[in-house]
Amino acid sequence: NVFAFCESVKTMSDVGPHQRWAMGALYDNQVTDGLLAVQDGCNNGSGHGWRGTNFILWNCTAGQIVCQSPWVTGLNWCVGCIGTKEPGRRKDRPDGEWISHGTPVCPSSLYEWQLQSRLENGIILTPLLL
């Protein structure tokens, strides 16, 4: 899953995965004036627990950013993002991988770079219908 080039303003909640272990998504060039978060949601609401694993936040801009990783089962990445680094709801949870915080990286869009690379190399992904 990819969320690319989205903008959220005057948000009433955080931007990011919600409830019970979402797996493997890319947030590419997200912009929000609020909180962008991949974290342990604890017992928030109806028992969120870990909200996501194997997430990449790529060149996003947010008022605040939380990027935590589960202890043993995956990593979350915050790469080239701009925004105030926050500890999250549970401050004792491990940090995700923070790379180039405050300075965007190249390629400017990981999604577009991967798509272009795949198309140039003739790799066609065929959907699997069940």
PLM feature segments, named:
Residues 13-14, 34-39, 64-70:
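Acidic/polar loop patches that form or flank catalytic/metal-binding clefts of enzymes
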Residues 42-130:
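Long terminal segments
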